[in-house]
Every structure is written in C-alpha cells, then in structure tokens.
C-alpha cells in the first residue's frame, strides 16, 4: 500500500511508520512537527504541514500516488482539553474534517483513525466492549467521538471506508531503545515513573489509594506501542480485504494498578522512584480495561507484549534518552 500518515513523527505514529515500512509499504509522513521528531522516522519522506491545508494534502497524495490514510495528528491531553476546549475542537475535529475532505477529493478510500477509550467515559461494567455506552467526559474524548461520527457519514455518503481504533493506555518503546515517547510532554503514569527513575521528576503522584481495587490504586489497561502499530497495519489489511468500515478496541484485556507499575519499574531500573499518595482526581474511574475479543476475532490481532516488556522497553528508552531526542 501507499500510505499517508498524519502525525507520523509522533510517538505512536513513528512506531507505526517503522512497522509499515518493514513490511514493504510506501509511507509519507505529514506532520506539523509541533510535537513530532525527525529522528523518530529516519529517512521516511516528511511533509511539514497542517491538516487544514487542503491544497497541500491533495498535492502530497497526488504527487506520491497514495491510496490510504492513517490519521494520528491530534492534541491528546485530556486535562488541558478541559481548560482549552476550543483548541481541541479546532485541531482534532476541524483539522480532521479538512483532512478527510481533501483526501477524499484526492482519491483516498481507506482511513485508519487513531481514536481512544476516552470515548467511553467512566465504564458502568467491565471489560469495555465496542458496544459499551459512549459518554466522553472531556473535550478530548468528545473530539475523538465526533471524528468517528464524521467518518461514518463519509462512508455513508462517499464510500470512504474507515476503521477507528480505540486505544487504551499506550506505553512502551521500540525494542532497541532508540524510539519512545518524548519525556518533556508526558502526562501518563509509566513515562512519569520513568522520569522519576532518571531523576527528571522529584516524585510520582499516586492519585488515591482507597479505590475498590486489590491494592486500592487505580487500574488501567496498558498496551505496548508496538502492538498498537500492528493494529493499524491489520486495520488497513481488513479494509483492503473486506471493503467495509468498523471500530475496534486495542487493549490487552488486563488491568494493572499504579502500585504494580511502581513495583515493577523499581525492580527493572534498580532505582528507588519516590512516590506520594495524594487525593483522587475528580472523575477518575477505579478501573478500566478492554474487551479486545473483536479485534482478535475480526482482525486476527493480539497483543504480543505484556507489562514486563512495556516496563523494560520504557526504561531502556528513558534511561538512554532522559530528554528524548534533545541532544
């Protein structure tokens, strides 16, 4: 396939680009480089631009004869979205609309969309399946759900097929330790734990230890970035074979607590990793994990890496690159 990858110089995007190239696909990365890194994609063709720039999008697709689109480009800080909702709706929703229309006009008929488990909000039952209620609780989650809805109408009205992949908690790094999440912008638990391990963070805040979970701390479904990358490749293959749209959860189907993460990270790194119990954050659910049976059955996808590999690769990346790609 010949694929345009927006946000392809970012964390999940760059790992997906590497996998697609390794299997023989031709890839062009389209990225604003606000948060992306050239070092993460090597010699992959890169176009620096904004998804709202429809003439540029159409030119890139036409010049390279691209037939598929994977759309990662988005802001993703749920907390910030509560302070700056307009920023998220403008970039994530309006930017996506401009991109999809330009891609459609340029002849693209397959789209893989980077969605999120945040579209579900606080689950009433576990595990979370694709038909669970959709109640996003912040503008970030709402923006992703709106894009999913747009894609359904692009399919109905234009025949543009799409697969939305609802990720759970992305984590981990490349197996060689040479690519991972930029530690300067992280807000998720595992990279924050690693920042503390390398001395770039004084201590890890543990938000609540009185949840109805085995050790009282929050439980989440952590999925390795390489397994997410594989899910995108499988989604492209699914559309090429079946010519229809769908939505899939990408998670391991298992939850891990904050204290479990800390214990394993301390053992792996050999560092103390100071942590402090602080009050719960409003709206944080006690536990979240995926029902991934649909992706397993329909896509033939299954996670290959567990929590140990997530922590091992995260530590290798952060220990070798405590400031990310910054020299």
Residue ranges and their predicted role:
Residues 1-173:
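N-terminal Rossmann-like NAD(P)+-binding domain of SDR-like oxidoreductases, especially those catalyzing
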Residues 6, 90-93, 183-187, 222-225, ...:
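Short, solvent-exposed loop/helix junctions and linker helices
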Residues 38, 168-189, 199-220:
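Short, flexible, glycine-rich and Lys/Arg-enriched loop motifs at helix boundaries
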Residues 125, 136-143, 182-190, 221-225:
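The catalytic Tyr-centered alpha-helix of NAD(P)H-dependent dehydrogenases
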Residues 152, 190, 229, 233:
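Short alpha-helix within the catalytic core of nucleotide-sugar-dependent glycosyltransferases
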Residues 195-327:
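C-terminal substrate-binding subdomain of Rossmann-fold SDR/epimerase-dehydratase oxidoreductases
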């Amino acid at each position: 396939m010949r694929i345009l990858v927006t946000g392809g110089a970012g964390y999940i995007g760059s790992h997906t680009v590497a996998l697609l190239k390794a299997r023989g696909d031709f890839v062009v990365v389209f990225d604003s480089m606000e948060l992306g890194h050239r070092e993460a994609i090597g010699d992959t063709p890169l176009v620096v631009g904004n998804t709202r720039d429809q003439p540029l999008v159409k030119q890139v697709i036409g010049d390279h004869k691209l037939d598929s689109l994977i759309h990662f480009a988005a802001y993703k800080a749920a907390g910030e979205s509560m302070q700056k909702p307009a920023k998220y709706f403008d970039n994530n929703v309006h930017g996506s609309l401009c991109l999809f229309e330009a891609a459609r006009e340029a002849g693209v008929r397959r789209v893989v969309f980077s969605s999120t488990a945040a579209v579900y909000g606080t689950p009433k039952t576990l595990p979370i399946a694709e038909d669970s209620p959709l109640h996003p609780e912040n503008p970030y989650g709402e923006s992703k759900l709106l894009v999913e809805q747009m894609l359904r109408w692009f399919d109905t009205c234009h025949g543009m097929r799409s697969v939305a992949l609802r990720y759970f908690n992305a984590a981990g790094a490349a197996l060689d330790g040479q690519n991972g999440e930029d530690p300067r912008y992280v807000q998720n638990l595992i990279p924050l734990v690693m920042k503390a391990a390398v001395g770039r963070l004084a201590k890890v805040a543990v938000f609540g230890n009185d949840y109805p979970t085995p050790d009282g701390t929050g439980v989440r479904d952590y999925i390795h970035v390489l397994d997410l990358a594989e899910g995108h490749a499988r989604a492209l293959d699914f559309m090429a074979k079946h010519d229809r749209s769908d939505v899939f959860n990408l998670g391991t189907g298992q939850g891990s607590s904050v204290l479990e993460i800390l214990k394993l990270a301390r053992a792996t790194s050999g560092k103390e990793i100071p942590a402090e119990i602080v009050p719960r954050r409003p709206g944080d659910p006690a536990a979240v994990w995926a029902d991934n049976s649909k992706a397993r059955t329909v896509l033939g996808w299954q996670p290959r890496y567990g929590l140990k590999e997530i922590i091992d690769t995260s530590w290798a990346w952060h220990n070798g690159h405590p400031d990310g790609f910054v020299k």
